[in-house]
Amino acid sequence: MFVSRKAFEAVLGFDENIFTSVLTNFRNIDEVSEKYGKFDFVLADLGVSSMQIDNPERGFSYKKEGPLDLRLNPKAGRPAFEILKELSKEELENILVENSDEPYADILARNIYSFIRSGMEVETTGQLYKIIDKTLNFIEDKNRKDIVNKTAARVFQALRIEVNQEFEVLYEFVEKLPHILKPGGRVAILTFHSGEDRIVKKTFKEMKNSGVYEDVCRNVIRPTKEECHRNSRAKSTKMRWAIKAK
């Protein structure tokens, strides 16, 4: 959803003297800082919005039929179904492993690749889900449906990360943070899967050891049971923080 700054601020009830909205990518944080100055505090929420997930036209969920798009910004980049057509079996397997730790990456990559090369269309969420379901037909566990759904969720996550270059964006963002924070400035980052958390944890630790940060989060912060009850999508959330050296 795209709205004008004036409309957004009118809904909030205050203007840009108090709150300024900027529509941009995390990797452009340095450009925002150049315009508005360095920050005392940065809170980065890396999650996909519920509005995007629940919109079948965006293709983020296997639960709803729609185009296999997966772009966070539908006006930029290329949809997932186009990228899938150009991937080798090895490239697809690597994406599934690196982006979602997928245990069935080998057989899934082989079958998805074979389906596409045979001329079958894989352009909708439903078509991809059917391939995943057929690939795992060897599973006879009573919880097979649950296993298939969890696998589908990981596959969609892996493709979304690839389509939007989310890891590359995150690497750029965390590398630029020290340059846009004031001395003593703080940053908190909310991640939603292990790949993101590993990047944040590793970078914060390295920068603390080099003296960039005076302190970093030692133990990841998780939502309480009450928070998860109010918002089930918060279950996978992890938060890490860091304080820039003065």
Model-derived features: where do they sit?
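S-adenosyl-L-methionine-dependent methyltransferase catalytic core, i.e., the SAM/SAH-binding region
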Residues: 1-246
